[in-house]
């Protein structure tokens, strides 16, 4: 399984603001994915969990870790150029079974058009 490297992550406030202000939001049961089309740029992803939306620091970190791991396992199926994506966790991301959270992320990425389907033999 591939790691999402430093080049694959949103790091600057400017990047997060650009995605938030100009991106399109796709809502799921456990998270929102905001996708900004950035032709020519490598695909990068960021994870956000607000204090008001999720809870204290331990809960926010756990929600981000859970989302990050699910996206990491699907990273090969995400186009490697052209998108900036921001995942915003809901409180339910803390308690949802892993499979429910994973299927929610897949559904939202699929509706955003940023997740390739699995090969027939997989």
Give short role names for the model-derived ranges.
Residues 1-122:
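Positively charged, solvent-exposed patches that mediate nucleic-acid binding
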